Each structure stands twice: as C-alpha cells, then as structure tokens.
Amino acid sequence: MQQRRIRRVPLSKMNKHDISAYFQGLQDTICAGIAATDGGASFKEDKWTRAEGGGGRTRVLVKGAILEKAGVNFSAVEGPLHPKMVTSLNVTEEVEFFATGVSIVMHPENPWVPIIHLNVRYFELSNGEFWFGGGIDLTPHIIIPEQAKWFHEQLKVVCDRFDSAFYPKYKTWADDYFYSPHREETRGIGGIFFDYIKGDKETVFEFVKAIGESFEPIYSHLMRINASKEYTQAEKEFQYIRRGRYVEFNLVHDRGTKFGLETNGRTESILMSLPPMASWEYMYDPKIFPEGQATFDLLKKGIDWI
C-alpha cells in the first residue's frame, strides 16, 4: 500500500474537505507505520459508499507477526440528519450534516501487547455549527504499571503543548467514559477523551492532529517491547477474558457503536473494533495467576499513573 504524506493545509483556508483530506492522509501514515512494525502482514482496503452521501475506506490487517486483527477506518459521510441524530443533537431546524474522521482498534496476538483505540473526528451542520471529538486509550490484557505510566506521559506531553489543563481534564473524561458500570471496572488504563469541542476551529484542529499523529509512534513502541515476550496458557486464556470485557463495553456502553448501529451505519466498519476471539467464563476467578488479580485491582477510575 502506497504511503501518502499527511496533507498540510493553510489554516486560514481550512474547510471540511481539507479536514477530511487530512484524515485520509493520517490513515495512510498510520497503516504504513504499523504494518512496518508488525512485519508480517499488510492492511487490506475495503472502499465503501453510503447511499445517503459519502463513504469511506476500511483497512484491516489480520494474522500478522504481532497483530491478530487491526482495523483503521476512515469515513466522510453527509446528508440529512437521521431522526435519532436530530434528537441527540437537540436540533430544531432542518439541517444536513457532514462528519469525517479516523477510528482505530488493534488486537495483538501476544497477551503482553496491549489493545489500543484511537478516534479523531469532525462534525459539521449546514447551519454553521461544528465541533471536534476524539481520544486515545490503552487496554492492556495484563497491566504493566511502568508502561501505563509511560503511555500517560506521552499523552501529557502532547496535551501540554496546547494547554496544561487538557491532560487532567481529558484524562478524567476518559476515566468516566471508558467505564463499564455493570462490571464496576474501567476498560483499561484509560488515556484521554474529548467531545463537542468547539472554540477556534484552527486551534482545536491542531490539537486533534497532534493526538492522531502520536498514535503510531506510541503503539509501535509498545508493540516492539512486548511482542517477543513468552506467555503461558493461563495468560492467553486471561487475554480472551479481557477481550470479552472489551466486547461488553463496546456493544453495551460505547456511544459511537450504539449510535452507528441505530442509525443505519455501516455494520462491518462499526464492528471492526471487535476481536477475532474472546471468551466468557462463568464466575471467572482472576486469581488463577498473580498478574490477573493485579490487573483487575487496577481497573479503577482516578488512578494517577504519572
């Protein structure tokens, strides 16, 4: 797959099509970098169109040297607001929408390599309203505190380039968002999450770009340092249990997944986030090995990893 340079747009002339073109370039760059780190497979592309307007490119890597399944989705869709969107956005006038972004989830083969998720997006209404959203979070199957600390440090560095208040604010937002009430546990070690961010379009977009561009170097590093670690059968089984909890969150609590399925979104692209294999064991006891219980003990909101 040919790598394309990320498009740089003069901020004073930026419009929705420029933002969409940037996200396409981000998808290209991330796919090229992650495939190079994996070294065992490449991303296959599935282009699709939406009857109401727009379309996207879903790229999936399967059975790589490190990644069992990885998806990088780009979309740019537009058209009349779905009735559920009208209610959700509390819109009282007849308007159309435009939405574009990149969504990523990666599931590794080795249980010591963490699951990662990224989403960066832009939404615009024909009445002139617009906002950005997104986030990046890490879900280790087995939490390694030193790596959790490193991950959060990288996010803080990016956030601090724009505003020192961003990291604590968006870290708390992620703790609250990536939480499964029915399990009373977080999905993983969190990260940052933000939504409905308006303000100055150019400034917010620069922040969103910085988050998107941090993904590949962060995850490539985590892949490299963990992929060769040996693991036991108990640790592999624990990985499937942790994947099961990931599935529960995505299908039961994730607003984007639920909203997409309820508004005639593209099902294959929406469910790209699910792992190829997961398990649910009745009354599972994580005490079968020390790292299992230690991981569940850290699936809590409000941990100051840094």
Please describe what each predicted stretch is.
Residues 85-87, 203, 258-264, 282:
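Short conserved micro-motifs at the rims of enzyme active sites and ligand-binding pockets
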Residues 58-131:
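Internal mixed beta-strand/loop scaffold within catalytic domains of large alpha/beta enzymes
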Residues 118-141, 261-277, 281:
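Intrinsically disordered, low-complexity regulatory segments enriched in Ser/Thr/Pro
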Residues 267-306:
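TerminUS-proximal long segments
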Residues 126-172, 306:
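Compact, glycine/acidic-enriched structural inserts
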Residues 16-90, 197-232, 236-246:
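Gly/Pro-rich turn-and-neighbor structural signature
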Residues 15, 104-109, 152-235, 239-247, ...:
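Long, histidine/aromatic-enriched segments associated with O2/redox biology
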Residues 3-4:
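Cationic, low-complexity basic patches in intrinsically disordered or flexible, solvent-exposed regions
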